[in-house]
Amino acid sequence: MSLSNKLTLDKLDVKGKRVVMRVDFNVPMKNNQITNNQRIKAAVPSIKFCLDNGAKSVVLMSHLGRPDGVPMPDKYSLEPVAAELKSLLGKDVLFLKDCVGPEVENACANPAAGTVILLENLRFHVEEEGKGKDASGNKIKAEPAKIDAFRASLSKLGDVYVNDAFGTAHRAHSSMVGVNLPQKAGGFLMKKELNYFAKALESPERPFLAILGGAKVADKIQLINNMLDKVNEMIIGGGMAFTFLKVLNNMEIGTSLYDEEGAKIVKDLMAKAEKNGVKITLPVDFVTADKFDENAKTGQATVASGIPAGWMGLDCGTESSKKYAEAVARAKQIVWNGPVGVFEWEAFARGTKSLMDEVVKATSRGCITIIGGGDTATCCAKWNTEDKVSHVSTGGGASLELLEGKVLPGVDALSNV
């Protein structure tokens, strides 16, 4: 799925116009401090383009976290983002305490030329996602008439609409598909992301290696299935590997992750790999733990020895890392989605760290390396490799759905050209 038939910001006339722009400022926070500003930085080129080309105003809207339609300004306010954005843009940013309603509409109706406005968290309104919880935590659905009113209010905040929220492009939420303006364009981040994935999937450099980690096979079935039609090699690591190893090798896996649902189709996936000539690499050894805890007792295990009862595998071992390194060394293009161990904890980070080192090495010899957002992007931030790979996606779920071969609603909703 590419933007080839969609309107993009570089083709949009913004002079004298109010631009309402959906961005993805869903950044990690600790004690109201932003811990990784990658997503904010990623939106700056689109914002600057509008200002440099004479836009009257740029009104930015985003979600943060999962307040589920309940206003939680103490926990999920976008106000800290306004300060960060001010320092990145080098100009004042007006923060509004809501995202819809008469006061917001007034503030956005006729601002001074060149004004940048940031709205409060869209998800403080249940109408953004269409469902959520009430103040007591009971599940609720938004009323259709109220969804329409919410969308109509957002539509009043600009003359043209730009969507640069690649990280949310897989969600058919009000701010993504419900703004009713004559011109709806994809921003530069959206364009960059979609172009990278389109090229990677439609005309890949070969050998093409997919590294798939993470926990559940069931969550990644469509991903594995779709990628088996595209790649030459695949590493299946992380917690997901135990389901494969138990089914294929009858390995004793102790209390390691096991996915009942996913187990049923392991053999089908392996048969497809064989039919397509895809070489699959699974881990052969493990770092084990006596409980799921940062300070657990640790041990070693292999596929042959099995993992003892009451213990679990939380990282791959050195032999697995060697096998992974060989696969990486053969590749001319790599897409990596999901870590191969519990990298957040030092004792179980070595497998993912050594794989990252190999991917960085591959990049420096000209291999195209694409990191598919989410946890794997967090690994890049943690080990400072964001500029040492070809592309770090800003969207975990969105990149996953592209790799699964799905149409993204947020892209679908843009104006055709």
From Swiss-Prot:
GO cellular component, one term: cytosol
Residues that, per the record, bind AMP: A215, K216, K220, G239, G313, E344
Signal sequence extent: none
InterPro entries for this protein: Phosphoglycerate_kinase, Phosphoglycerate_kinase_CS, Phosphoglycerate_kinase_N, Phosphoglycerate_kinase_sf
Keywords, in A-Z order: Acetylation, ATP-binding, Cytoplasm, Glycolysis, Hydroxylation, Kinase, Magnesium, Metal-binding, Mitochondrion, Nucleotide-binding, Phosphoprotein, Transferase
Residues at which (2R)-3-phosphoglycerate binds: V23, D24, F25, N26, Q38, R39, S62, H63, G65, R66, L122, R123, H170, R171
Single GO BP term: glycolytic process
PTM annotation (Phosphotyrosine): residues: Y76, Y196
Residues noted as binding ADP in the record, renumbered to the chain: G214, G238, F343
Residues with PTM N-acetylserine: S2
Post-translational modification: Phosphorylated at Ser-203 by MAPK1/ERK2 under hypoxic conditions, which promotes its mitochondrial targeting.
List of residues that carry N6-acetyllysine: K11, K48, K75, K86, K91, K97, K131, K146, K199, K267, K291, K361
UniProt: CDP binding residues: G214, D219, G238, G338, V340, F343
Gene Ontology terms for molecular function: ADP binding; ATP binding; metal ion binding; phosphoglycerate kinase activity; protein serine kinase activity
Modified residues (Phosphoserine): S2, S4, S203
Enzyme category, top tier: transferase
Family (UniProt): Belongs to the phosphoglycerate kinase family.
Record-linked HAMAP family: Phosphoglyc_kinase (MF_00145)
UniProt subunit comment: Monomer. Interacts with kinase MAPK1/ERK2; the interaction is direct, occurs under hypoxic conditions, and promotes its interaction with PIN1. Interacts with peptidyl-prolyl cis-trans isomerase PIN1; the interaction is direct, occurs under hypoxic conditions, and targets the protein to the mitochondrion by promoting interactions with the TOM complex. Interacts with mitochondrial circRNA mcPGK1 (via its 2nd stem-loop); the interaction is direct and targets the protein to the mitochondrion by promoting interactions with the TOM complex.
Protein's recorded name: Phosphoglycerate kinase 1
Species this protein is from: Cricetulus griseus
